[in-house]
Amino acid sequence: MVCPSPLRECHPFLQRSFFPSFALSHRDIISTRACLNDNSPAFDRRYHWVWEEDRRCLNLGKTLASTIHHKGGNLSLQWQRGNTTTHIATRWDANKLLLARAILKEKRNILQDKTSVNVNVNKLIPIPKKKVLKNRAKSLLSIKSHVHFHLIPFINFFLLYHQIILSHSLFHISHLISFHFLFFSFLSFPLLSFILFPCFSLFLSSNSFSLASPFSS
């Protein structure tokens, strides 16, 4: 079947599933008509393949799948673009049941395609932009935890060192022991810094535990 010149670009849904020779755009109108074996019309409906920024209308696959149970019936499809009309007639048989499964599977694949335009058909899946924002939030949380567990211990190290200098007790053996104990504790358990650092500051500034400054007269 030769593809008319206005219908050269093929949509992946049609290319992999049904008619690889035809394509659709926002200007295409799809007409379907299915008849039973006795030629009584099962339905005669007209569908528009709608292209918008955030949704795709997949009524074509839905229509084709709904006609599969008429295994012996006839299905006619009609593409209409302006004054150009293309008719397709086919006869369903038992093998077309496999085609129905392929259509439904392809429809799910399109809905789950993260690289395609945002799809919103009956709100079956969330908009992919929300997933991107969620992943960005997770990355920010991981950066925050990384900074917390690796940067805070060293900040506390310099704060404690500065506090020892100010208290003029750098050479006091008890302060050195406490200082090293707290420092290595902070490296292993950063959350302890918020509890032990104020206590250690009070310990250094206490008059009962501080010695006279070696620099005082």
Curated annotation (Swiss-Prot):
Query: Which keywords does UniProt give here?
Result: Membrane, Mitochondrion, Transit peptide, Transmembrane, Transmembrane helix
What is the organism field in this record? Schizosaccharomyces pombe (strain 972 / ATCC 24843)
* Protein name (Swiss-Prot/TrEMBL): Uncharacterized protein C17A2.11, mitochondrial
Top-level taxon of the source organism: Eukaryota
Signal peptide (UniProt feature, chain positions): none
The way this protein sits in the membrane is described as: Multi-pass membrane protein
Q: Where are the transmembrane segments?
A: 151-171, 177-197
| Subcellular location(s) per record | Mitochondrion membrane
